[in-house]
């Protein structure tokens, strides 16, 4: 089951019914958290306590296999200190999102060792193309090695010849900067 949470901004320009219909057309069962249907102060999907609790609840829910964020926006750095990371560490699941979700991706990696999926979000499911969906499935189902490729019409340019090894970590630069000097900051050593 795909659990959808809204740890940042509220839903805009689509409906939960449309999102559910589109995700089900890809074969997913869908469960929405409380925050998905909330709008708090016009720019948050619920108050900080609700959004933090929704994250914990989805990690605790044994029926949920994958957690995908509804959308980005603003607000994840407000809830980083409200999350019980032991819950997440003891119930690891793929966690997908980008933009403002970078704050959670960094915190989950730093505190729980969970490798985040910097990827598509549920509010955009109606705009997914075949390449996007195939990339999501490949990332979620890989066994040994994940092979990344660009769309055929997008050429890959090599900036520097050679090989590199390490952990690739990134996301929204403003969120990476916002976590610098905190316990959620990227360890860029490796």
Name every feature range the model reports, one short phrase each.
Residues 85-108, 115-122:
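Short, acidic/small-residue loops that bind anionic groups at enzyme active sites
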């Amino acid at each position: 089951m795909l659990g959808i949470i809204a740890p940042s901004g509220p839903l805009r320009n689509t409906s939960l019914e449309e999102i559910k219909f589109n995700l089900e057309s890809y074969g997913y069962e869908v469960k929405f958290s409380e925050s998905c249907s909330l709008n708090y102060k016009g720019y948050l999907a619920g108050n900080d306590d609700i959004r933090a609790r929704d994250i914990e609840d989805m990690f605790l829910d044994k029926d949920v296999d994958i957690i995908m964020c509804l959308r980005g926006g603003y607000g994840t750095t407000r809830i980083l200190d409200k999350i019980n990371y032991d819950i997440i560490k003891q119930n690891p699941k793929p966690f997908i999102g980008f933009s403002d979700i970078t704050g959670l991706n960094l915190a989950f990696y730093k505190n729980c060792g969970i490798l985040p999926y910097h990827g598509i979000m549920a509010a955009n499911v109606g705009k997914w193309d075949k390449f996007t969906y195939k990339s999501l499935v490949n990332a979620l189902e890989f066994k040994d090695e994940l092979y990344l490729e660009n769309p055929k019409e997008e050429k890959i340019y090599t900036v520097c010849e050679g090989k590199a090894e390490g952990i690739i970590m990134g996301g929204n630069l403003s969120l990476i900067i916002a976590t610098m000097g905190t316990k959620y900051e990227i360890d860029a050593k490796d």
